[in-house]
Amino acid sequence: MDYTNAIHIIPDAAGPDAWANAAAQGGDAGIWATEDDYNSQWNADGGGGGSSRAGSEQPPPGKKSRGGGGGEGGGNTSKSRAIGKMFFKTKLCCKFRAGTCPYVTNCNFAHGMEELRKPPPNWQEIVAAHEEATEAREEHQIPIMTSSGPTAGGDAGCGGGGGGGSGRAYKGRHCKKFYTDEGCPYGDACTFLHDEQSKARESVAISLSPSVGGGGGGGSYNSAAAAAASASAAAGNGPMQKPSNWKTRICNKWEMTGYCPFGSKCHFAHGAAELHKYGGGLVDIDSRDAAATPDSKQAVVSAKAPAETAAASTTVLPHADVYHLGVQAQRSTIAGQRSGQVQRPIQKWKGPDKISRIYGDWIDETE
């Protein structure tokens, strides 16, 4: 086969003396690409990718490269590429002159005077504006700050601010330890907010709130009220005004265990001698006993009522189905447990006589 026409060599249009006289025509040696220019081309291509590779190795247009980040990093890369395109083939390739250019037709520098281009006339202003925008973006980035001061042992609500404000301040959030009896161990160095007025206002609101859950909720209300009183005392607000429901009920903890951790600060009475009226004033013991007598009688009557109801419910059971003895015994046990409910009389099975007229194809044996 004849391979003479397989390769067609195109001579340099500028002639053999164009490379030798390029510096003289350009006026200075700046027309030739330097090592810095090659390095910038390498970085702009992403470490050897992009325009430095053949078209078959480049990713498809719809697919993002693995190393390319989105957001602000992607914007910087696109602007850098725009600057690189502005200087595309504006300098002559020294490696092509030496015969060692690895980029061949994908090189960003001119491989001859016919490929040489001129940059835009205002290229210096464009480059300066790009550098200023890059510096301003770096200044507005939030630095990662580490705190060298002590930390509050595992508590996210309080943190030490050591190192002269080296830690990030969270003055918009309230300190959790500041509202406890012990107080915040960091004091003014704490990075969270210490609000004296809100502390006093919160303690008064807790003490004036009504009790929750009736008699069973005395313990929890007692704890909240005592904590509010101690917090108010720690804040230096002086003696707090007693609420209208002060010691109007017996303390559950004191009545069950004989001990209350709050002592004299408890909002509930420790015995009949400490009982107060609603709004203030001690309760008269004689009138309290007289008022308690009807309650005891009512309790005796209410205790007798379930027993009578249970007896009435058990009398209905013998009229139930006598053919199911096991079910009858079980029903009697359930009826004994449900003493407070009214037992329905259990109706006896009517047999097929009552349902023989439901279906049209039923054969009535009586006919």
From Swiss-Prot:
A zinc finger (C3H1-type) spans 87-114, 169-197, 245-273. Keywords: DNA-binding, Metal-binding, Repeat, Zinc, Zinc-finger. Residues 38-80 are annotated as: Disordered. GO terms for molecular function: DNA binding; mRNA binding; zinc ion binding. SMART domains: ZnF_C3H1 (SM00356). InterPro entries: ZFP36-like, Znf-CCCH_4, Znf_CCCH, Znf_CCCH_sf. Residues 67-76 have a biased composition (Gly residues). This is Zinc finger CCCH domain-containing protein 56. It comes from Oryza sativa subsp. japonica.
